[in-house]
Amino acid sequence: MRGVFFVAVAVAIFARSSAEAKLLSEAAPGLAADAVISGESRERFLRVADPEDDDLAAPADDGKTEERAPKFKSLNEIHKKLDEEDMVHVSKILGNMGAIHADNIAKARAALKAAHESGATTANQLVAGLAKPV
């Protein structure tokens, strides 16, 4: 979209300074309109020349097409925000580590008891496995 704008400005500057300005200004108006109104740019118009022309009207505000300015002014702010979000995520994981560890120990003890009942381990191995680590 910017490229089309810059090309149009360059053509206008060259046309103004040349003797062919009148010829260029009488170009078919539909040609310029077709170049601008194509594909996605149709959804991004901010101004409409004719309010009755629904073809160029901005889409309804459904939250999907709305364009907003970014909330961050620099990459450092984005980096800080991502670090904060990462730290919150890490703190949640560390907060759950006690429960996760207890669950893993319970599963290991159950597996050790099942192995002892099937005869895969001895009584001494069972006692050593069930002893609390130092």
Curated annotation (Swiss-Prot):
Chain span(s) of sequence motif RxLR-dEER: 44-68
**Upregulation:** Expression is strongly up-regulated during the early stages of infection.
Please give an example of a GO cellular component term from this record.
Answer: extracellular region
Residues of the signal peptide: 1-21
Q: What is the protein's known function?
A: Effector that suppresses plant defense responses during the early stages of pathogen infection. Suppresses cell death induced by effectors and PAMPs in plant hosts. Is able to induced cell death in tomato, tobacco, eggplant, and potato, but not in A.thaliana. Interacts with and destabilizes host 1-aminocyclopropane-1-carboxylate synthases. By suppressing type2 ACS-catalyzed ethylene biosynthesis, Avh238 facilitates Phytophthora infection.
According to the UniProt entry, the note on domains is:
The RxLR-dEER motif acts to carry the protein into the host cell cytoplasm through binding to cell surface phosphatidylinositol-3-phosphate.
What protein name applies here?
Answer: RxLR effector protein Avh238
Species the sequence originates in: Phytophthora sojae (strain P6497)
